[in-house]
Structures are given as structure tokens and as C-alpha cells.
């Protein structure tokens, strides 16, 4: 979509740059040509539709972020990390884990949330 828009704008820009100098008054032919160019370019400039489609039966997954922070922990010797020392103990005692997990919601809970939202909208 962006490529089409860029090509269309490049064509219009090159046509404007290479046109002969025109008089101060625009005649009917120039107005019609400008309107035609605008009609061609306008559909390309509208935003593209989102392709976020959910089909029933597919699994819903989302990134789940887990932060492990063992700074100041003295319960055990931290021997999990095998890499080089960073120079600061605080940096070596933290970890961030990102994992895609299936998100499941019970149908009855979803129904209750929907009804609650609809009731809230009706009351306004």
C-alpha cells in the first residue's frame, strides 16, 4: 500500500516538475486534469484496513513477559548464569523471559464481561 502511494506521488511530482510554465489563470482543461489526478490518487491515500481477524477454533496466543529479579537474594548461591561477569552484580541477577502462551477464557466469563459492558453502555 505504501509502495503504491509512493509511486503515485512520484508520478504526480514528476509531472508537476516537468510541466511548462503556466499563466496565472487556470483554464478549464487544467482544472479537469488536476481533478482527475486527485481522483486517481485519493483512493491510494486512505488507510489500509486492519487484518486482525479471529476465526473460531483457532488458538489465541499472546506474549507473556516474566521478570526474574534475584538482586539481593541470599537464600542460595546463584549458579544458573554461566556467562561472563558484567562488572556489576545487579546486572547479572536479573532476567527477562518472553514467551508466547495460549490465552484461554471460559465462555461464561466472556459472556458476563460482554453483558456488563453492554449494561454500562446502555446506562450512559
UniProtKB/Swiss-Prot annotation:
One of the record's GO cellular component terms: chloroplast thylakoid membrane
Localization per Swiss-Prot or TrEMBL: Plastid, Chloroplast thylakoid membrane
Post-translational modification: Contains one phycocyanobilin chromophore and one mesobiliverdin chromophore with binding mediated by both the alpha and beta subunits.
Binding of mesobiliverdin, residues: 73, 81, 97
Main location: plastid
Pfam families: Phycoerythr_ab
Subunit structure: Heterotetramer of 2 different alpha chains and 2 identical beta chains which form 2 alpha-beta heterodimers within the heterotetramer.
Similarity annotation: Belongs to the phycoerythrin family.
Protein name: Phycocyanin PC645 alpha-3 subunit
Species the sequence originates in: Chroomonas sp. (strain CCMP270)
